[in-house]
Amino acid sequence: MAAIEGDLLEEPLTAGQAEGALPLSAEAGWNQTAEDWRFMLREGRGIGVRAAGRWVGSALALPLGARLSWISMVLVAKDARRRGIGTRLLRRAIDMVRDAGRVAGLDATELGRPVYLPFGFRDLYAISRLRIKGPAPAEAAPAGCAIRPLAPADLPAVGAFDEARSAMERRSVLAYLLERAPETALVAEADGRVAGFVLGRPGRVAFQIGPLVAESEEVALALVSRVLSRANGHTIIDVPDAHAALRTWLDRHGAMRQRGFMRMTLGKPPQGLADASRIFGLAGPELG
């Protein structure tokens, strides 16, 4: 614990304090649940600022393998802004990542990107958050491709497939998402090998689809359309802007763009991280 100024105290933010941190993301209108906070704080490291017994600022760093760590949840309560809290916590998160010998990555909001650029973060690719209301029709899988429910026994093969295409070692993230929403988890196979997969999770305001990783746009569309065919209520998905065909299909079925993100890194990104060609949906800006 370290005193900053006045009533502000900086201290570690731990999984046991997830419920106390949740109002920060809820106030910002973000989609994370207490379960999401708890997972990220258990798997990664958090730092926060408290005032009068409540959390008024946060930042997290989630390791995604030996080379990469994802910074997220850089939040400051509205009534505590303009006191340097966000900048301080971002610096602390960057230091945590560097001390571990990793490269820092993040998905910046349109408002956040100008804040990150002076720190040395550089753009990789643009992403759009799309919101879809209600179901959409399921599309056929390409010839030779079969889609079935993803089971826990599939995680080693799915994790290896994902790492080779996302440059992220995030098997704990995949296992968490499978546990949160097993009914959404699907795997596509062709010639006895993984050709794609999709996972999802319930959020505070909408169900989030992702990650969606596939060998082709056709496989990705078959996977995501099956999830949407069973949708009840609002669904969100974060799609790299490069995937025009998927975006066109989603737009045709009522998708509305909510906001944009920019994937960024501080330092040289791991090989493949800047390649969005097989990343059709993010796990979310907080999970990579």
Predicted regions and their residues:
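Intrinsically disordered, low-complexity, positively biased terminal segments
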Residues: 1-7, 14-19, 39, 50-52, ...
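A generic, well-ordered mixed alpha/beta core segment in the N-terminal half of proteins
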Residues: 90-96, 105-107, 112, 120
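Conserved catalytic-core motifs of GNAT/GCN5-like acyltransferases
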Residues: 103-107, 122-136, 257-269
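Conserved active-site tyrosine of GNAT-family acetyltransferases
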Residues: 116-117, 121, 250
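Surface-exposed beta-loop interaction hotspot
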Residues: 124, 129-156, 160-162
